[in-house]
Amino acid sequence: MSQSTSVLRRNGFTFKQFFVAHDRCAMKVGTDGILLGAWAPVAGVKRCLDIGAGSGLLALMLAQRTDDSVMIDAVELESEAAAQAQENINQSPWAERINVHTADIQQWITQQTVRFDLIISNPPYYQQGVECSTPQREQARYTTTLDHPSLLACAAECITEEGFFCVVLPEQIGNGFTELALSMGWHLRLRTDVAENEARLPHRVLLAFSPKAGECFSDRLIIRGSDQNYSEAYTALTQAFYLFM
């Protein structure tokens, strides 16, 4: 398929090296996931885990960024989303490196004997509130199925001693998540606060935790400059993925 044709594909998002269909997934491809997939530290990793894989976006981004020897497990509870993730992965250059599991992560973890150097998740963060249009979207948006303490506990069960567990969250929720993680024995090692432009306060935060203590590196990322174009920093982070960047 030519690039000009692939650009016109509907019901999904076209990246430089792969296409993500998301019409059967409750949560669509968005800036949060793209930021996390491009930002998570991958140096030296051998095995990755994507918790709540959805359309497979994060697993595909990690596959693009890592060596051919790196294996990735993508766990998704909702069967339609998991099926679409599998289809997206089958059509990508990395089908042999990514394994999709339709499972509850809390049960799946208990059956694993391997540990992961990198665990990544774009987790739900809303408390139960306004009713969603579908049960699938409610599951993707709310923490009722997998709350944050359970998510942190799952990651702790299967991470290597020097591994990283990375998430993206709204700024204030991220601060609470950090306090919770620290109370559970995690160490914050990387933090990037994300703002739409220089005039606005950060609205998202990228966090990387590790079981191993060490210095925490913090910075700020501005998505758009005063001219409304993508900033140099955002371009440098994501240009390997965005089609027209």
UniProtKB/Swiss-Prot annotation:
Gene: yfiC
Cellular localisation: Cytoplasm
Domain of life of the source: Bacteria
EC number: 2.1.1.223
Enzyme class: transferase
Gene Ontology MF term list: nucleic acid binding; tRNA (adenine-N6)-methyltransferase activity
Record keyword Phosphoprotein present: no
Similarity field: Belongs to the methyltransferase superfamily. tRNA (adenine-N(6)-)-methyltransferase family.
UniProt catalytic activity: adenosine(37) in tRNA1(Val) + S-adenosyl-L-methionine = N(6)-methyladenosine(37) in tRNA1(Val) + S-adenosyl-L-homocysteine + H(+)
Chief localization: cytoplasm
Gene3D superfamilies documented for this protein: Vaccinia Virus protein VP39 (3.40.50.150)
A single Gene Ontology CC term: cytoplasm
One of the protein's GO biological processes: methylation
Role according to the record: Specifically methylates the adenine in position 37 of tRNA(1)(Val) (anticodon cmo5UAC).
Pfam families: MTS
Species name: Shigella dysenteriae serotype 1 (strain Sd197)
Protein name: tRNA1(Val) (adenine(37)-N6)-methyltransferase
Keyword line: Cytoplasm, Methyltransferase, S-adenosyl-L-methionine, Transferase, tRNA processing
HAMAP family assigned to the protein according to its UniProt record, in alphabetical order: tRNA_methyltr_YfiC
